[in-house]
Amino acid sequence: MANHKIAIIQFYPEPNEIESNHIRAVTFIREAAASGAQLAVLPEYHLADFVPSHDPAIRQQCANWKKYLDAYCALAKECNICVVPGSFAELHDDSTIVNATYFIDNNGVICGRYEKKNLWHPERPYVKGSKNDTRHTAFDTPLGKVGMVICWDLAFPEAFRELIIQGAKMIIVPAYWKYTDASEIGMKRNPKSEGVFLDAAVVSRAFENTCAVVFCNVAGPEKEGFAGLSQVALPFVGCIERFENSEEGMKIVDVDMNILEEAEGAYKIREDIATSDWHYGYNR
């Protein structure tokens, strides 16, 4: 398996500044391509900072999501780079909003789309989760078989299992995850508890699924609860690159995918799951 150069873009979405956020995101992607990255990943809700309490009018702005998706497709082709443009809050004709992410290949073609299943509690009054009868789906890309989940999905190992059963070797996680998500009670116990959660979960998912996990979180002022901590993890070696704070920036990570085969040879997790008498009953 090949090495891949992946750009994780820890990006601060200025509230309700969709157009200027897009312009800044494009600049980061161009820089990633110029640095030789094969894939650039942005965080969840990177265009709109979709927190309905900020401004109810943001709902109507979410109707323009297709314009920006098309722009990212054109940019990916122009720069010869694959792009996961974080996630979009998509307002559809039936007046529902969904939280969706895409994998765009270096020819500008959409290889895969995913709608967030496990909505974070404040999203639920405003955002529609994907249907219960839809599976997590892995898909082919220039970087191999890939799966995607969004933010709080990281807390559910079942999502990752469904993806590796289908052969995913890399799972990409755009996120909008803050220290304050721990609630007031959790923050009193440990103000950085969500950092402990993120570091543990990202590395655990990599080990327990013999896959690469690319976690890309939003940036923002720590005094407002932003955690950052975007990172990439592999089995055997754990976290191979990580933002140590919540500042905006980009890291180009060299990901040795050969480690996945070595780890599978040791742990045989995929081999066990593929047997006909696998005892946990995951969907095949």
Where are these regions (language model features)?
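Extreme N-terminal starter segment of soluble prokaryotic enzymes
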Residues: 2-8
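Active-site beta-strand/loop signature of hydrolases that rely on acidic residues for catalysis
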Residues: 21, 29-58, 76, 83-84, ...
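Short beta->alpha transition motifs characteristic of CBS
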Residues: 48, 102, 114-120, 231, ...
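CN hydrolase (nitrilase-like) catalytic-core segments centered on the catalytic cysteine
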Residues: 64-84, 155-250
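Short beta-strand scaffold segments in enzyme catalytic cores
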Residues: 85-87, 100-103, 137, 230-232, ...
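Short loop/turn motifs at secondary-structure junctions and domain boundaries
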Residues: 91-96, 221-225
